Design a protein with these regions (language model features):
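Conserved helicase motor
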Residues: 37-39
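C-terminal accessory helical subdomains adjacent to catalytic cores in phosphodiester-
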Residues: 2, 15-35, 47-57, 61, ...
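A conditional alpha-helix N-cap/helix-loop micro-motif detector
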Residues: 43-44
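Short glycine-centered, acidic/aromatic-flanked micro-motifs in structured strand/loop junctions
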Residues: 9, 66-68
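Short polar catalytic/cofactor-binding loops
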Residues: 11-13
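Conserved beta-strand elements of the Class I
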Residues: 4-8
Length: 206
């Protein structure tokens, strides 16, 4: 049976966190989500990831969520625009290749680039991070208009606001941090998250 939405995400952080974020938007999360395990894999194997998702889950809409910092670091792209163009082109090729086949193809494929990394989206609800026991609220003194532009290194910013001896690489801690995010607030403080929020919200649930 077809589902209204499916996700392909870049790595473990997104795979573990996006269900929590989306469930706050829709009140539930029963959508398929694929961990592509690296930006290089998404760029090289977009068609394979799409084929798996379409073949097994038949989503009407697919959201591919990426960040460009790692792709830039690996020399795969020069900026987020190029990354989005490459992946969209791969998506178009997949649709063209499969259009005469037996698969029920999605109505829409959206590529959302987190600027600069997925952690930018976590930073976007800096106010609610103050209530998270992993963080030292006294260290979070800033007010932001657009964290995408105003926080150059989101991972370092988050690390600098933690309580002592907190390991952000621990899976349980990553989940706790993601659960803090309020989508409606984050959408006002991150332009890239606002795009994600819009695409997640704009689905046909009929």
């Amino acid at each position: 049976m077809a589902v209204e939405l499916g996700f392909i995400v870049e790595g473990h952080c997104e795979y573990e966190s996006i269900p929590s974020i989306v469930s706050k938007i829709h009140g539930y999360f029963n959508f398929p989500i694929i961990n592509a395990k690296g930006i290089g894999n998404i760029i090289k194997n977009t068609s394979d990831e799409l084929l798996h998702l379409v073949k097994h889950f038949d989503p009407r809409k697919i959201i591919i969520s990426l960040d460009y910092r790692e792709a830039e670091r690996e020399g795969l792209v020069k900026d987020c625009v190029e990354l989005k163009e490459i992946v969209l082109r791969n998506c178009e090729q997949f649709m063209q290749t499969q259009q005469n086949g037996s698969l029920e193809l999605p109505d829409e494929i959206c590529v959302i680039i987190a600027d600069k990394t997925y952690e930018s989206w976590i930073c976007a609800d800096y106010e609610n991070l103050k209530t998270n026991p992993l963080f030292n609220a006294a260290k979070i003194t800033e007010n932001f208009t657009n964290v995408d532009e105003e926080i150059p290194n989101p991972c370092s910013w988050l690390q600098s606001k933690l309580n002592e001896d907190i390991d952000m690489k621990a899976r349980a801690n990553r989940k706790k941090v993601a659960q803090t995010l309020r989508p409606d607030f984050a959408a006002t403080k991150s332009r890239s998250f606002r795009k994600f929020h819009k695409e997640v919200t704009n689905i046909n649930v009929a």
